[in-house]
C-alpha cells in the first residue's frame, strides 16, 4: 500500500548508499564507534614500526638533506598548487643558492593536513556528504627519476597504473609483517614507468632494495614530481589502489587505517612546520644588538633549535653531526643528564 511504499523508500535509499561503501570500512566505523580500534591490532603495528631498524627511503637519508616544509594552509601564499606546473619553478627557486647541485633539496607535504586540491570525482563517495580532503600520507618532493628504496623487508602486494586525473599514476603496495606476524602495508604513489620492470606481485623485497623511481607529470597522475608515502594497517577490500585522503569528520577511523607515515621516515617535527623566526630575521636582530667581534659561522646561517644524541637539529628539522661540543660524548638531551639537571 501507499503507506508502506512511503516508509520503505528511505530504507531502500540507505541500502543503496551503503552498497557503494567499502564493507570493511563500514566495519571499521562501527568498531571505532563502539570504542575499539578501527582496525584490530593497529596500535601493535605502530608500536612495531616505532622500534624497527629502517633503511632510508631515498639514497640520501631525508633526515640529513636540505628541505622545506610545504603546508597548503595559505602560510606560503606564493606557492602554486601541487597540481600546477608552475610548482616546479617555484620549488627550484626555494633551493639554497650555495647548495651543491649533487645534493638533494626536498619538500615535505604534511600528514593529516586538510587540502582543497582534491576536486576530482574519485575524492567523493557515499560514506559521507563531505569530500575526502584530509591527507593520509606524507609527500616527499624531489626531481623526477629520484630512486626510491624499500624501508624494510616485504613482499610486493600489487603493481598498478591508476590512470585517473589526480590519482596515483604508477602505484606500488608492499606487504610487511610485525615481529608477531601481523600484516600491514606501505603504499608508494606517483611513481615512474620503471616500476613494472623493478617489481612484480609476489616478489620478495629486502630493506634497501631499489623499488621505484619518482614519476614525472605525464605518468604520475598529473602532479609535481613527488612520492606519496603511506602506511596502511588494512587494505579493507581494495586492490591495486587505496584511499590517499580521508574524511575530516571520520579522521579518528582513518588515522587507525593509515597512521602517520613518519613512522617510516623518523623526521624531526620541525620538518613539517614553518618557523615564524627564520635565520634571516634573527641575523638582522643580532646585527643590531651584538658587536661584530662575535662572528657567525657559515655563508648560509644555521638556526639550531635543539640537539639529540650526536646531532644538532636546525629550524627545518635537518640534522647536522656535532663534532664541536663535548656534550656529544654522552649525547645531547641524554635522559640521565636531563634528569640530573632537573634535580639540581
Question: Which residue ranges define each predicted feature?
Answer:
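Short, glycine/small-residue-enriched coil/turn segments at secondary-structure junctions
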Residues: 98-101, 128-165
